[in-house]
Amino acid sequence: MAYMLAIANFHFFKFYTRMRKKHENNSCNEKDKDENLFKIILAIFLQEKKKYDCISSGSIMTASEEYLENLKPFQVGLPPHDPESNKKRYLLKDANGKKFDLEGTTKRFEHLLSLSGLFKHFIESKAAKDPKFRQVLDVLEENKANGKGKGKHQDVRRRKTEHEEDAELLKEEDSDDDESIEFQFRESPAYVNGQLRPYQIQGVNWLVSLHKNKIAGILADEMGLGKTLQTISFLGYLRYIEKIPGPFLVIAPKSTLNNWLREINRWTPDVNAFILQGDKEERAELIQKKLLGCDFDVVIASYEIIIREKSPLKKINWEYIIIDEAHRIKNEESMLSQVLREFTSRNRLLITGTPLQNNLHELWALLNFLLPDIFSDAQDFDDWFSSESTEEDQDKIVKQLHTVLQPFLLRRIKSDVETSLLPKKELNLYVGMSSMQKKWYKKILEKDLDAVNGSNGSKESKTRLLNIMMQLRKCCNHPYLFDGAEPGPPYTTDEHLVYNAAKLQVLDKLLKKLKEEGSRVLIFSQMSRLLDILEDYCYFRNYEYCRIDGSTAHEDRIQAIDDYNAPDSKKFVFLLTTRAGGLGINLTSADVVVLYDSDWNPQADLQAMDRAHRIGQKKQVKVFRLVTDNSVEEKILERATQKLRLDQLVIQQNRTSLKKKENKADSKDALLSMIQHGAADVFKSGTSTGSAGTPEPGSGEKGDDIDLDELLLKSENKTKSLNAKYETLGLDDLQKFNQDSAYEWNGQDFKKKIQRDIISPLLLNPTKRERKENYSIDNYYKDVLNTGRSSTPSHPRMPKPHVFHSHQLQPPQLKVLYEKERMWTAKKTGYVPTMDDVKAAYGDISDEEEKKQKLELLKLSVNNSQPLTEEEEKMKADWESEGFTNWNKLEFRKFITVSGKYGRNSIQAIARELAPGKTLEEVRAYAKAFWSNIERIEDYEKYLKIIENEEEKIKRVKMQQEALRRKLSEYKNPFFDLKLKHPPSSNNKRTYSEEEDRFILLMLFKYGLDRDDVYELVRDEIRDCPLFELDFYFRSRTPVELARRGNTLLQCLEKEFNAGIVLDDATKDRMKKEDENGKRIREEFADQTANEKENVDGVESKKAKIEDTSNVGTEQLVAEKIPENETTH
């Protein structure tokens, strides 16, 4: 330690001497920078000296103390952290945003051109459209010309001379002197409260390099490698090294907001971060105090909040905008993407574990968001990387993609950076179908035979095919997913649950084996209803389990994860839906993952696997994917393997990413091909491919057994065959790949023959429904023979009647003019009304004779119609401006509800409930028109009754409040002395004591009867009161039971004061003042209670509180609410 201190001492004085020499020729600005650096070096020197003194004296610093000591040198030179200073740096001074940065843009372009000449294409394309970037290109050309003047043979490849190398070294030395020292972390930064792994340090250095070169980037490490920690460490670099404490905006999914805040507080506790969330009022308070008050370093918000609160967020000049799960902005037309493009920021960073999931255009959308000045034209980007036919061209394009993406994207996978994490073993388990599954599979195909055969001339709708696909996938999972498939009632949990689904048979064998081996299992499925079946199965087999799906509450979700990850947990199985449980969860206590079915998007399955296969996993993870052989699932798996092969070819080679510009996997042709796959086997075979025997419910028998070892061996060979098939495909094959290519060999197309073999068994025994549908051949020939005709109807349709909503209070005369105009339009176009027009105009009419009369009336109206006169046109325009067409039904219903809640005359309270959709003036105008024309509103009696009933409740509550006030004012100490003249009957076996009744009345008076949560507050007061500490009955009452007793007591008071209470204007004014006074007393009481809790023990505080409430508080409370000029009874 002494040696290290001596070395530090030597370097400190060496640095100090160099700074003094340098200052002789430096400007004031550069001197300030070096002065800060000098302070940092001095602080480090003093810190090392303090550590040496501690060790010499024998004292030991705690980890927290050591971190705080390590942090002190980094805090030197930070800007003052107070809201007023922050406002000068955080708030935008120019409403139009920042000006064009010629120097920064030139530096960025120069750096990219130094990496590859390919960027010149995009820069020139941008310069041709924008004169600002033409200026940048001119500066670059000028710099290039100046550089060429220094050497005569730069374009000739040869060895450098000593003179040239010396010149380059001198140039690098000058650049080091001109700028502050560039930090390259070789170990975990001291400002991070923990240790970073070596690859994470490399990631931080990469982010630092991007920042230095003014380039935004995509951190696309595989999930589980600590992207959040790397990002927080980089923000720490900006804060402590660059002295840029903010403002930073982190945008993340709602489920990970708290995790971001926890990680920031854990790794860099000095950073002031907060989450912008809550209801409208809570968000408004946060925005006013924290955001616009500039009392923050980092703001964390969800995608939805960004859209809702875009207006205040646009006022901040963000240093960095960081987007977690950045594939949310892959569509540049989405609302989130458009809103974010309106924000002003100096830099941007995208974080994602799945950089691209679909095509080239989505890659361009991400790059356009990061660097809009370079990647400005989507068409140009697509054309530049369009694939050619030859293999050489494919290799060239792959190399170009790597070169272009390399500066912006960092992607590492676990097997590369985490040597302690063993690679996961994946195996596709190919299972057959049970006899019940065969039956249902065949039934689904027969139900829509024309669509399955593809025999119609017109193409089937994509929705229809997707529906068939979904039903077939359900059948492959378990036939009990169909209503009516499970035998019963009575419904039993028996062996039939397992043996009616081949997948569950295999899973049953597999889980038994894994249980014996001591493994723990995660089971993922797309369908939450399948998890219901698996829950019954786990109960049947006595397997302890946890479950998470899309409907699981956040608290239950965390509890389930904690229970499963707890030491010595007995939970064997964790059931999860792929989308809800595949993101943001750490389940490394499991070592086996079972994918019960496959997702359309293979990245979702990879995310599911990574719940267990991530850093911290000590065992080798095994992944079993259940696939129904010769079914749609097999084709879905092939499609997923194709996508992942593309990822391996283009993304992993240089850790950059690209997805092909592919035909959609769910296109009609591809869907039809998937549906037809294996259909012939289903119709040819009447027996099961999985288990021929299906036991009856309740029999306790088992179906035919499965040899698991043999199945594993066969599945392993088939999995290898599938992977080998796609390993040989090149980039062009993958970009143009579709299912038809599998039928082409040696120049011949075998597709038609194979489709005949598939389809013909389906037509052998068509059902009656299919026989009727064969008449659709007429539709086919009609379409074929009329291909040249226009699909437009030969005559126009009659305009539909104008829809009038009675609550919008439009003038009734306007409807007459609209109808007259509609009839004239029909006459002018020569339209003859039909029965459809009768239904549209008069609704459903059951009487045929009446229908004919209405039709004749409609025809007569059309024949006798006349165009609107000029006066009628003017009246129509005037009447259209009247009414309240901007009030929709939802707002009208809310108006009715809050009018009853607050009373029809409480316009301000009603307007508060309807804000921000309606202003106070709009509500006042509508209320006036509503009560003046209420008879014009349909079912107005119903709405009037709702409001009047609610107003009666308000009036009754006020009467009860007044009766309660008068009763309490009769006694000096009502908690002990109050007596009811008409006490409630005590017929019940267990009733309330007089002391309990008095306490309920006192608490009702304290909080007010008009509060919705008054009985929840009364319950809390009872449980906090030491007088009832041993009264289990009273303490265990629910708010509903207390409300029942409270209403009974209030009715007794109403009897007592029934004749003496009149709610005149004077009484109402006094009660309003009392409410305000009571609110003030409650606030003071709450503040007093809070202070007491800080200074005394909890029990003494409660005693003081009840004594104050019972002896003094009530008397004072009643006295303050009684006017001085009113005498008590």
Swiss-Prot record:
The modification Phosphoserine is found at S846. The modification Phosphothreonine is found at T694. PROSITE patterns: HELICASE_ATP_BIND_1, HELICASE_CTER, SANT. Its main location: nucleus. Its EC number is 3.6.4.-. A motif (DEAH box) lies at residues 324-327. GO terms for cellular component: chromatin; Isw1 complex; Isw1a complex; Isw1b complex; nucleolar chromatin; nucleus. Present with 1500 molecules/cell in log phase SD medium. Component of the ISW1A complex, which at least consists of ISW1 and IOC3. Component of the ISW1B complex, which at least consists of ISW1, IOC2 and IOC4. Catalytic component of ISW1-type complexes, which act by remodeling the chromatin by catalyzing an ATP-dependent alteration in the structure of nucleosomal DNA. They are involved in coordinating transcriptional repression, activation and elongation phases. The ISW1A complex represses gene expression at initiation through specific positioning of a promoter proximal dinucleosome. The ISW1B complex acts within coding regions to control the amount of RNA polymerase II released into productive elongation and to coordinate elongation with termination and pre-mRNA processing. This is ISWI chromatin-remodeling complex ATPase ISW1. The gene is ISW1.
